[in-house]
From Swiss-Prot:
Function statement: Structural component in primary cell wall.
Sequence repeat extents: 18-33, 34-54, 55-70, 71-91, 92-107, 108-128, 129-144, 145-160, 161-179, 180-195, 196-211, 212-232, 233-253
Annotated region described as Disordered, given as residue ranges: 1-267
Compartments where located: Secreted, Primary cell wall
UniProt-recorded name of the protein: Extensin
PTM note: Hydroxylated on proline residues in the S-P-P-P-P repeat.
Alphabetized UniProt keyword annotations: Cell wall, Cell wall biogenesis/degradation, Glycoprotein, Hydroxylation, Repeat, Secreted, Signal
UniProt biased composition (Pro residues): 20-267
GO biological process: cell wall organization
Tissue-by-tissue expression: Mainly in the coleoptile node and root tip.
Gene behind the chain: HRGP
Region listing for Highly repetitive, in residue ranges: 18-253
């Protein structure tokens, strides 16, 4: 094989690996040291403290109490009640078509709150819970623990160790430990819980429900309106979907190999 061709072949073969990029090391730029700021010493005592002027005491001039103007008593002009003829109002009751007797409708007005008088019965079962007060629960078991005081615990075994004292110490003065004061807490009187006031709701008088006015609609002439035929909904025929075409297969373009130009052959 010709040496020039072998060099060209080798350069083509080894050109597939990209050259490693080694950046030139930059010298570390030294950070400039900030100049130390030395403030000029101010003479502290040269400036006498200027006394603040006392603000003048503002004494507001007493305003005379402005008398509130009494609002004029509104006396409505008496309307003559006789000018309003109440005759046209009784005419709607006359507009009760007799041919349609609404006999089942008057029965609901008969359902008046008259059977509600049992509500006037005082709520006797409610006062019974207030009678269950915590007063019969005497806190007697609590005073019993205070009776368990340290007094029955005689500190006699503790004075015995002071008897085991060196001979220079006179055993005649064994410092007996002071008996701890028997802490007998003052028995708190059982604070009876305040009995909640028996809430006796004021019996509300059974408010009679106003009888609803018997609404007698005007008799509509039956069968005068021909039944409108409901339009038949249009049958929904879905449009046939075209057969799903396969997406075009993506053929990636081959990457352009950026191969450097071969070095000139060595002769």
């Amino acid at each position: 094989m010709c040496p020039a061709f072998s060099i060209f072949f080798n350069s083509r073969r080894y050109s597939l690996t990209p050259p490693t990029y080694t950046p030139s090391p930059k010298p570390p730029t030294p950070k400039p040291t900030p100049p130390t700021y030395t403030p000029s010493p101010k003479p502290p005592a040269s400036k006498p403290p200027t006394p603040k002027p006392t603000p003048p005491t503002y004494t507001p001039s007493p305003k005379p109490p402005t008398p509130k103007p009494t609002p004029p008593t509104y006396t409505p002009s008496p309307k003559p009640p006789a000018t309003k003829p109440p005759t046209p109002k009784p005419t709607p009751p006359t507009y009760t078509p007799s041919p349609k007797p609404p006999t089942p409708k008057p029965t609901p007005p008969t359902y008046t709150p008259s059977p509600k008088p049992p509500a006037t019965k005082p709520p006797t079962p409610k006062p019974t819970p207030p009678t269950y007060t915590p007063s019969p629960k005497p806190p007697t078991p609590k005073p019993t623990p205070p009776t368990y005081t340290p007094s029955p615990k005689p500190p006699t075994p503790k004075p015995t160790p002071p008897t085991y004292t060196p001979s220079p110490k006179p055993p005649t003065h064994p410092t007996p430990k002071p008996t701890p004061p028997t802490y007998t807490p003052s028995p708190k009187p059982p604070t009876p819980k305040p009995t909640p006031p028996t809430y006796t709701p004021s019996p509300k008088p059974p408010t009679p429900k106003p009888t609803p006015p018997t609404y007698t609609p005007s008799p509509k002439p039956p069968a005068t309106k021909p039944p409108t035929p409901k339009p038949t909904p249009p049958t929904y025929t879905p449009t046939p979907k075209p057969p799903a075409t396969k997406p075009p297969t993506y053929t990636p373009t081959p990457p352009v190999s950026h191969t450097p130009s071969p070095p000139p052959p060595y002769y």
